[in-house]
Amino acid sequence: MKHSLRYLLILSVASFLKTSPAFATNPLITDQFTADPTARIFDGKIYVYPSHDIKAPPEYKGKPDWFVMEDYHVFSSNNLTDWKDHGIIVSQTGVDWADPTAYAMWAPDCVFKDGKYYFYFPAIPKSDGENEGPDAKRPEFRIGVAVSDTPYGPFKPLPTYIQGVTGIDPNVLIDKDGTAYLYYSLGKIFVAKLKPNMTEIDGEPMVIDNLPTKGLLEGPFAFERKGTYYLTYPHVENKIERLEYATSTSPMGPFKQAGVILDESESGCWTVHQSILDWQGQSYLFYHDQDLSPAFDKNRSIRADKLFFNTDGSIQKVKPTLRGIGLVNAKSEIQIDRYSAKSAGGIVVSFNDEANPLAGWKTTFSAANSWVRFNDVDFGRGKQKTIKVRAKTGASSTLEIHLDSEDGPLLGRVKIGEATDWKISSATAKKNPKGVHDIIVTQTDGGAVEVDWLSFR
C-alpha cells in the first residue's frame, strides 16, 4: 500500500510536468538523462519512450558506477523540434511484481492494438525469499506490461510479468496480418509470438540464429519494410557497442546479417540502443550517446538523425550529427553549438557550466573568419527585425550572420562589447528572409567571443 500511494503521488506530480517543453537538436532532451529510445507514431504525433538514467540516490545499494533507472517518461512531438515531456508513466514503486529498490527499469517499448496502448518494460522481480543472504544472486530480469487508453498514460501495470520470458530490451512487432511478435535479449536475441491479448506468449520463445556469436548482443528492434523484415541490434564487435542489422522474409527468421548502421561512438559510450521509423517520407534513427555526461557513460542522452535506404533495401550507414533533425524557429534561442558544419580552426564547443552539463553548451570563436553553419532555420513569413546574441568577451568582437553561405546575403552584423558576464547584444536585421534557410555565423574581428545563442526577433 505504501508503494501504491507513492506511485499515485508520482503520477500526480507528473501531471504538472505536461507543459514542460524539451528542446531541439542533439541531444533531443537536455533537462534530464534519457536512453534506449523507442520512437512510435500515434495519433499523428511521434512519441518517444526512453529509459531514464539518474544519479545514484543514497538508498541505492546496487553495483557501483552502474545504470540507475527508476521510472519511465514519454515525450511527444508533432514537428521533430519541440518535445513535450508527459511526465512519469511507470515507476518501479508502482509495479506490484517488481523490486522497488532495484533501479533496473531498462529499455522499453510501446505499441497500439485494438484500442489499447501496451507498454513493455524489463524489471527485476521481488525476491521470493528462498534465495537470500550475502552471496545470493538477484532474480533474473522479467518483462512486464502496462496498459493505457492513450499513448501518454496513465498506464496501469499488470499484476505479474509475462510468463515464460526471462530477459531485457522488449520490442514488439505487429505484422500486417495483426500477429504480434515479442523480441527480447538475454545474451542472445529471442522471439516469441504473442497471444491476441498482447500479455502472454503463444508457444515457446526461440533463439534467432545466424547472428554474431562473439561479443555482447542485445537490444533488438524489428520492423517491416516492403516485404523485408529488419532486425536491428547493438553488438560489441570490439570494445563497445555498434549498431548492426539482419534481414529476413519472415518475422521469426531465419535472418541473415546485413551490415552496420552506426559505428562505435567516438565518445566511447559503451552502449547504444535504437529504433527506426518513417515520418512524412523520411526515415529516422533514434539512438543514444553520452552528450551530457562525457565522463560517465551510464548517464546517457537520446538523439536522432536521418536514415536512408538504398534501392536494394540495404541501410546506409548513419553519421551522427550535432544538428539532428527538424526545423528550428528563427525566433527561438538557436543553439549554434549544435552546428551543421564549422571552420577548420577557431571554433571550440564547451559546457556553459562544467559542474552542471544540463545547462548546455557555448561556442567560442577565437580566430578571425572562424565560422559555424546551422541548417534548417525557419524564418516563416520573414517578419524578424532584430538579431539578438547572448554572448560574452574579454575584448570587443563582431559577428556577422549570412544566409545560406559564407558569402551569401548579410543578415546582420552584431557588435559584442566587452563583458565578463553573459549579456544580450542586438543589431537591426538587414534582410528579412522567408521560409527555411541555413545561417552562417562568422567572427570578423576582435577578441575571442563566447556565444550561448542567437535569435531573430
Regions found by a protein language model. Name each.
Residues 1-6:
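Positively charged n-region of N-terminal signal peptides that target proteins for export
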Residues 23-413, 419-457:
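Carbohydrate-active catalytic/glycan-binding domains of CAZyme proteins
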